[in-house]
């Protein structure tokens, strides 16, 4: 499931106690964070920068096809639900030096 919204959010947080756990992550100062979540968690990225970014699975310049957000303007969000165990590298198509990993465990 992929959802793009125009809502802002606060600091990064985890709500894994519910049936639909959510992990929030802010894109700020041209930096992505490494993220660890459980299977079934939805990660919600919020762009806090005044420049557009994407969150795109893969390693620059290759898109792996797992997820690829549209260009996110300031305060826009992108969500992706992780349904499989693994390590998923991701990057920004606008700024390929921005890279990080989502680690998904049982």
Residue ranges of predicted features:
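Extracytoplasmic copper-binding redox domains, predominantly the cupredoxin/blue-copper superfamily
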Residues: 9-106
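Sec-dependent bacterial lipoprotein signal peptides
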Residues: 1-8
């Amino acid at each position: 499931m992929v959802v793009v919204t125009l809502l802002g959010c606060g600091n990064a947080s985890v709500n894994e106690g519910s049936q639909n756990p959510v992990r929030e992550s802010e894109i700020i100062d041209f930096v992505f964070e490494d993220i660890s979540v459980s299977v079934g968690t939805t990660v919600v990225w919020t762009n806090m920068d005044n420049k557009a970014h994407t969150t795109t699975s893969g390693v620059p310049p290759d898109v792996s096809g797992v997820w690829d957000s549209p260009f996110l303007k300031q305060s826009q969000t992108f969500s992706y639900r992780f349904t499989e165990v693994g390590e998923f590298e991701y990057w920004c198509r606008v700024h390929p030096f921005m890279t990080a990993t989502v680690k998904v465990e049982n």
